[in-house]
Amino acid sequence: MDSNTIRIFSFCGGGTKGYGSNRFMKKFIQQWGIPQADLWKYADVMCGTSIGAILASGYSFGKTQDEMESFFTTYAKRIFTIRTATDIATGSHNASQDSYRPDLLSKLAIIATNDSFYRSAYEDSNYGHNILQQVLVSNFGNSTLANFKTPVVIPAYEEDMKRYVVFSNFNDPAYFIGNNESIVNVCRASSAAPVYLPAHNFNGHYYSDGGQYANDAILAAINIGLTVKPNANRIVIVDVGTGIGNMSFDGSGTETGLEHTAVRLFGIMNIAMTGSEEWSRYYLDYLSNRLALDVYFYKFQPKFPVDFANEIDNSTTAWFTQLSNLIDTHYTNESDKIASILTHLTA
């Protein structure tokens, strides 16, 4: 790559809707004409939050979009499922059904106990966060951030210290931590969505989802890009969102005041997470169109129809098929913009 251009790829959080982000990248890479496993060779910096952290880690580690797709189509249904009443009554440690999600009242009951929806009940349980841990280990083993092939930025929240942190393999301890931390731990930290998955504990600290404050880590990625390529005069950014919609309780079937309150609170969380993405979009759009800087920016961010199930723990085959169709339609509708950013990437 030339030394005059900084190329950045950002992947936002959104749970299983990250399947759409990976599908976008699969189509984008195919249109670009480069091997799937070689994306890192064409990126100066990658960043990601929550599921975006897992995608950015995979791509920077040399994983293909086909490989990352199995995270959703094969394993999500076991991460986002719980034990049935029969499973519990019979004393089973395991969940007998795929994609068996708690309903709204059950979720409220779990929240009331300060627990997470998809916490595995036992260390040997075949569902929940145990499966997330197993899948990450099978993909990254004991590798650390230092094994990434390109600089990566991953935000998380350090709960016990009430501190916002940014993990990176870029060595600048004044601004980043975890250069030699395991990829598994960092991905678990950034993807521990409150109430959905338990906070992840390592090195004496508890971490939860970076999407609580930085669902799009693009600004930190730009800073690293400017540092590793101080003489660059062009910045090209591909920022991949998981779509705009209701990321949590949809409010259907609510009857009590408590239920309506829960819907409202989770709606606010949705606004906060999506809002951080849209604020980054606003900043970068202004930067590229109004200031005398050579910045080229594309945001892939489909707007989902009101009848689409947008909660971040959907995982059925039918749902992934529906999401795939929506992504394909948006990709087609954005063909001119996508062709334009590819021109700048390859210039």
Residue ranges and their predicted role:
Residues 2-12, 16-136, 176, 184-187, ...:
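Patatin-like phospholipase
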Residues 115, 133, 146-230:
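Active-site gating loop/helix substructures
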Residues 2-4, 123, 198-204, 212-215, ...:
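C-terminal helical/tail subdomains of lipid-metabolizing enzymes
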Residues 11, 167, 208, 300-303:
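Hydrophobic residues at beta-strand termini and immediately following loops
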Residues 12-16, 51-54, 61-62, 157-161, ...:
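Conserved beta-strand elements of beta-rich interaction domains across eukaryotes
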Residues 1-2, 34-40, 137-152, 226-231:
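Surface-exposed acidic, glycine-flexible loop patches that form ligand/cofactor-binding
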Residues 116-120, 125-151, 250-287:
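Surface cap/lid and interfacial helix-loop subdomains adjacent to catalytic sites
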